[in-house]
Amino acid sequence: MNERTTPNLDVVIQGLSLAIVAVLFAVLLFLLGMYQTRYADPYVRSVLATTGDAGRGHDIFQMNCGTCHGLYGDGRVGPSLQNVSERKSRVAIIQQVISGNTPPMPQFQPNPKDMADLLKYLETL
């Protein structure tokens, strides 16, 4: 074989390795940015900094959520919320409630104390 036209296998492997590392690093930075963005929201930070009351959260849940999710979160029109805190992070639950991105669930942004109470109640289901 002619050494001038045959690429050195070590150089090819090194180039591919560098490309893979660069892609993985870019993905890691993207995911880190997404994670930080979720926690940067002042509303989310305020809710997470507030101590919730599960009793008040139950009342808020029954008034606003119980019709679709069942009075005890066992699901009716909306999905069951039993063990929801094991399936979703606190931030994901807050964003699910306030976003309105899952029709037919309406957008709902209670004040931070009420959201902290609701979150505390959901953690008991």
Residue ranges, per PLM feature:
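N-terminal membrane topogenic signal
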Residues: D10-L16
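Extracytoplasmic electron-transfer domains, predominantly the class I c-type cytochrome c fold
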Residues: Y72, R76, Q82-L125
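Electrostatic cytochrome c docking/interface patches
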Residues: M34-I60
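Hydrophobic alpha-helical segments
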Residues: F30, A54-G55, G75
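Sequence context surrounding c-type heme c attachment/ligation sites in exported
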Residues: G55-M63, E86-V91
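The canonical Cys-X-X-Cys-His
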Residues: G57, F61-L71, L118-L122
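N-terminal Lys/Arg-rich, disordered targeting/topogenic segments
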Residues: M1-L9
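Hydrophobic membrane-insertion alpha-helices, especially the h-region
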Residues: L16-L32
